[in-house]
Amino acid sequence: MSTLSEGPVARLLKEKLFAAFQPKHLEVECESHLHNVPKGAEKHFRVQVVSDEFEGKRVIERHRLVNTCLAKELATTVHALRIDAIPTSKWDGQKQEDSPTCRGGFGK
């Protein structure tokens, strides 16, 4: 398990995801620095969760599980969440692809 960002929101997301899914692998990365937000903001995240809990579930079902787990944060502090929820049997150690460059914000 690894966490690429260690701010308080990233730590909370990591704790909640770990408790809910007992993942074989977990990455929580704050990508707010790629967006037009104040320095130090924790609003944009990507997560990679590899868990037996996702076995036999379609992608949309896996995403719903993650969204439900983080519902409070999504309703309050987290603006955007990129989810990579992988069943343990389908994970071969791959890392998430880099996120595309932000194209929005303040009329851009």
From Swiss-Prot:
Region (Disordered): 89-108
Cellular component terms (Gene Ontology): mitochondrion
Family of this protein: Belongs to the BolA/IbaG family.
Protein name as catalogued: Putative bolA-like protein K11H12.1
Domain of life: Eukaryota
Originating species: Caenorhabditis elegans
Matches recorded under Gene3D superfamilies: BolA-like
